[in-house]
A protein has these predicted regions:
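Charged, amphipathic alpha-helical linker segments immediately N-terminal to NTP-binding catalytic cores
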Residues: 1-28
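Globular "head" domains of long coiled-coil molecular machines
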Residues: 12-15, 34-38, 42-318
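Charged, low-complexity interaction regions
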Residues: 25-32, 351
Length: 362
């Protein structure tokens, strides 16, 4: 009871602050700020924890998420695949929306479309790809997709947000990803086996403005030559890369993992018969014993255990509130920056200030 009263007090204070900010003249005229404040108030009501999954196209984001879900449902490739923001909701196994997807379109007046992702998997995957089989530009056609699945061993109301790649070629990909990060509470940052590139560093500095909790994951450890560089050694090297390049050597990262998303997925989804293309060409199907070994070799359980433990703990609740307060502070900082800019313009040329800034003098 005490916890509920305390949370309600915090909720009331955040809503009151949001209402006061919404009355500021600079905010009243901005659709962007009004939408942000609406999102914050909605977050107060629902308190759904959101995790963005970010990385280059080649980092294996969709394969990773498929492994987490346990089914090969999201399209995955080394080129531009995730064309739209995809929200993956954790729902109970008996929920009427389980294994369903709702497609939201950009075209005004066009109704949402609900798809059974098991029975109509090809249609579902078409809506997530940059171009579907008819050559339609999905980026322009689809606004977002909500997917409802059950994550085993996770009872929390969690949403994983699959974002377009950092090296996206579609217009607005990067802006869309930044927007989603600003609305989320933590991020899983996926890197290809080569490690952290300059694009990753630039993006991470932007990301750290909005969030505090990061799971750093180097994928594709199955491609390593064990004689030249064992997975354990590569993971230690990657942890040093994160510490020195992202945190400038000042912070020891808490969550760093090396995985094979591919082996984890093949180990879990019994509908997949082959690990690599050459296995398919040779007609050699995976045995149950091999599937079990692939899952163990993937090191996926280490990441999953840490992630689910974090998502089930109190730290998650604090992160939700921190995120809302950061968003409010960002709006206030922007308003203050605009005020200072106008003040400097006024000081430079007081007589002409109203005319230059579209202000009436009578």
């Amino acid at each position: 009871m005490t916890r509920k009263i305390k949370d309600q007090n915090i909720d009331d204070k955040i809503i009151n602050l949001a209402n006061r900010i919404s009355e500021l003249e600079s905010v009243k005229d901005s659709e962007f700020y009004k939408n942000q404040l609406t999102n914050i108030k909605s977050e107060i009501r629902h308190k759904v924890f959101r995790i963005t999954v970010v990385g280059e196209f080649s980092s294996g984001k969709s394969t990773f998420l498929n492994a987490l879900i346990g089914k090969d449902i999201l399209p995955h490739a080394v080129s531009e695949t995730t064309a739209t923001i995809t929200y993956i909701h954790n729902v109970p196994a008996d929920d009427k929306m389980e294994n369903k997807a709702v497609v939201h379109f950009n075209e005004q007046g066009r109704k949402d479309e609900t798809i059974d992702i098991v029975k109509d998997s090809q249609k579902f995957q078409d809506y997530l790809s940059a171009l579907n089989k008819n050559g339609d530009n999905i980026v322009k056609l689809v606004q977002s997709v909500d997917v409802y699945v059950n994550f085993t061993d996770l009872d929390e109301p969690i949403v994983f947000v699959d974002t377009p790649g950092l090296n996206g070629v579609a217009d607005g990909h990067r802006d869309i990803t930044i927007r989603e990060i600003s609305r989320s509470h933590a991020s899983i940052c996926l890197f290809p086996i080569r490690g952290i590139g300059q694009t990753d560093l630039t993006f991470m500095r932007e990301l750290m403005k909005y969030q505090n909790t990061f799971f750093f994951v180097i994928n594709q450890i199955d491609t390593l030559n064990r004689q030249e560089e064992p997975p354990e050694e590569r993971i230690l090297t990657f942890k040093e890369e994160v510490k020195n390049n992202i945190y400038n050597g000042t912070i020891e990262p808490e969550y760093v993992f090396g995985i094979s998303g591919l082996k984890a997925l093949v180990g879990r989804d019994k509908q997949i018969d082959y690990l690599y293309m050459e296995d398919k060409e040779n007609g050699r199907r995976i045995t149950d014993e091999e599937r079990k070994q692939y899952l163990e070799d993937s090191r996926f359980a280490l990441l999953e255990d840490a992630l689910f433990k974090y998502l089930s703990g109190n730290e998650k609740d604090r992160e939700i509130y921190d995120s809302m307060i950061r968003s409010l502070q960002t709006i206030l900082d922007d308003v203050e920056s605009q005020r200072r800019e106008l003040l400097e313009i006024y000081k430079a040329d007081p007589p002409n200030f109203p005319k230059k800034n579209g202000l009436r003098t009578n």
